[in-house]
Amino acid sequence: MSRYKPFEFQEEAIEKLTKSFLSLWDSSARKCNLVFKSPTGSGKTFMLTHFVNGLNNLPNWDFDKAFIWITFSDTLAMQSKDKFTEYFNNNLKNNLLTVEDFKQGKLEKNDILFINWQKLVSQAAENRVLRRPSDPLLSKEQGYYFEDIIENTFKENREIVMIVDESHTHLSDLAQSSVIDVVNPKIIINVSATPKYIPNQEEVEEGIARFVSVKREDVVNAGLIKEKIVTQTEEDLKAMPGQDLDELLLTLAIKKREELAFEYKSLGKSINPLIIIQLPNDDHKLKSTGEKTKEQIVMDFLYKKGIDIDKKVALWFDGKRINMDHIENNESEIDFMLFKQAAGTGWDCPRAQVLLMYREISSPTFYTQTVGRILRFVEPNKIDDYKYNPNLKLGYIFTNYKRNEVKIPEQSEKNKPYIYTAYRKDIINNIEGVYSDFVSRVDYGDLGNA
């Protein structure tokens, strides 16, 4: 039994996943695709773990199978593994494995192997230590390779189910040939907020694919994610001439953070909104031209504004983490976090509400995954507390990307980002004595009742 109760939309998704999975299991085909589309912040991992755990308790269904859970980093692999422990504590009937457990030589019934996709598809020799060399003379004297694990599992007539997290990132031709074809799983569960592949009607009718989708509006109504994203882009910044664009971005972001902090305080909430600042991955290239890096610009600006760098600023770069302990807590004193791509996916900090994103130096690429870091709502179980504070139910992006370069994930026609703000001019006054009325077209006489 889970320690947490699912929301209604999550229960429905878990039920649909189970029904679709069982339908594909009965198919004679292999590599059947079950595509699970669910918005960022909807609890995809929560739903997946409950779906997998639920297979252990189905009446009249107890087939011999094991799972391989694919992520694209070691950190995310461990996060997914830890979620199982968090949700089910001692009630889990699945053994949770990592590459350290290769020594058992195979996957037992209901085992779940969590593994970093990059360690399986990398072409670099130093990163392919998990794969069996093509030259037998290069094989290690003892231990098991990934191929050994798969072969030994099948020798016991045990099926394998693959779960590919963030499948839109990983399902390349290389991944297909070097991993999926090797595993030859019975079912592949592709999980993504923005899947590249969605089964067509013919595939569904043939029984080789299924599609389960969660509506964004259901997630918003449950209070898990913010309603919309407000965006200020390069075009908006150029409408404010006479200011350095880098510093203008910081000024606008800080002002917004202060406004949000004031609103939280007025509600009696001990929530400190966080600004996350994404620096260019190629920030170092500015040094070669004699320019200050964006990191230097940001740090100098914050220092100039009297912000205590040691107490209020966190850094998250490869091999460098400063002031990151407990930063996810709503009451954390950290106001700013600088990062590159590290926080792009899988990092949860609901109090992160303002994203400042600088363009890449050489080849501008807007990282849509990063937007997901400001989508989560800060207090899902207290959504009614915010009914009169719409600003607190929004996320905010300040960027020097152009408007047509900004891509907000899972943005439907009903959920377009705010990019224009209209104001009435101060010199305009209401016109007294003018009234308006609404008359339906039927009453007006230009539209028939039919």
Describe these PLM feature segments.
Residues 162-164, 338:
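Walker B beta-strand of ABC/ABC-like P-loop ATPase nucleotide-binding domains
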Residues 28-37, 47-77:
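Conserved SF1/SF2 helicase motif Ia
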Residues 15-20, 54-60, 78, 82, ...:
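Helicase-associated low-complexity regulatory tails and linkers flanking the ATPase motor
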Residues 40:
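The conserved Walker
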Residues 1-37:
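Conserved pre-motif I regulatory segment
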Residues 123, 338-353, 372-374, 385:
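SF2 helicase motor core recognition
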Residues 68-74, 99-102, 117-118:
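A short hydrophobic beta-strand->loop->alpha-helix junction that borders the nucleotide-binding pocket
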Residues 43:
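Conserved glycine(s) of the Walker
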